[in-house]
Amino acid sequence: MKSTQRVTELVLCLALLGSLLIACVAAPAAPADTGAAAEPAASEGPRMGGVVTGFVSSDPKSFDPAAIAGWDQGVIAPNLLEGLFRLSPDGREIEPAIAESFEVSEDGKTWTFNLRAGAKFHNGREITADDFKYSFERVLNPETRSPKAWMLSIVVGAQAFQDGSANEVSGIRVVDAGTLEIELAEPLAPFKAMLASINLAVVPQEEVEKWGEDFGQNVVAAGPFSLGEWNLNQDVTLNSFDDYWNGRPYLDAVSFRFIGDENTRIVELDAGRLDMAWVPPAHWERFSTDPVYKEKLGWAETFHTDFIAVNLDREPFGTNAKLRQAVRYALDLDAIIASLQGRANVAQGLLPPGLLGYDEDAVLNYPTNLESAQALMAEAGFADGVPGTFDVILPPWGNLIKLLEIYQANLKEIGINIEIKPTEFGPYMEALESGNYDLAWMYRVTDYADPDGFYFPLMHSDNLGAGGNYARYANADVDENIATARATIDDAERARLYQEVDAQFAEDLPYIPLTHNIYVDVSTPRVQNYVPSPMDTHMFHRVWVEE
């Protein structure tokens, strides 16, 4: 049999993280204290003014919070967008933003937010509770086609609003201009973390209606920077927002150039035309020994997992768990880590270290073992190999293709032939959402710093297909454990439930886990107080430059 994967075009969001996966994997050994490397002593404290130039892999196309789904957008957008909460610069803490304070009812279902007086949009208008109601209902509105509508699906009245039987979401209530109330159908442990997502940022209705389909290219929001000049496929500039509720940023502006090639970024860094870049493996030795740059290396173990998604609706891989287990045993992940110079860790499941529920003593146990792989091939009914060739679709990132060639050679040893199919991001995502694929390389960076950001979209049957469960995995016990964990406030009990999910995952393997990235970047000596984030975001509101 063959697997002739047809992929059509798609959006331009995820392909960018491929660059991240390869350019940002980690070096032989991180310094004892991860996060940003120690800064050289500055002659003075933070100073106002200046411009920092960063990069993303390609033009983000849109900063509409309801539509954001890709890496390039996610790097830049947190500087433009803000909602009730925000992430700290290192991505590990949730900070109050436009919600100055909040209360949760005893039953955990009703959340009341007291908005910060005087917080403004970039157009100068003060933000009110009505703006949040509008923004959240816009995400839920089927006409918006937001890929993150599931984040608010637990709000009372969300389903009625989405199916057209109600003209508003009854569980989102404006108490007064400065007070917002949200009622959930049941308690949701990660709700606060979800509200820090850029997808749930507040936007002004009048600007959305003014710009229509072009709002994403002319976004008006409430973050520390506002959208400035945007040169298609070249660069975008964000300008400091003087009326930001927390005081204007130190910088006058941040510019992001669109540079896909990792070596070009290094050339531009050396020429003084970039202030930061990922450190490719080939350049690690140079930067780690340079007396200036070695003090400007930043590290972060990311909340990022790469894996091979299996379409469970298609034979033979989707209908045969033993065949999927054989695939995992056959993959030489240590060779992958070596090729990345140690800038990644072997993934023992979907969940990366550092998130609630990760248990290194209870993780997936599929070490590279050809004998085990061949035994499982025989049990699966394919002792002589699987007839035919099967496509693996993936974004068209050069270094990623090189990694897939290692997997291709591994699988050939046990009689599985795959063809590597680089696919533009639009068609790639279209294939995942429609189920028009057999195997696909994928990654996930959690939308919020909670295990629910992995398990609910990828494994709950409510999210089959476009909702994020691209494997089309459905297991009633897993659904129940995920749902119970979402509604449980006790962290120990949540961790136990997720470990039960992991145990079932290890048996079923709807996704074949590969690696977790370790992010390594370098900045020029003038950049101060920059911290890389495990969430793959670049936050600049506390960055300053020393000239």
Cite the ranges covered by each PLM segment:
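Long beta-strand-rich cores associated with HINT superfamily self-processing modules
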Residues: 521-547
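Ligand-site clamp/hinge motif
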Residues: 213, 241-287, 408, 417-419, ...
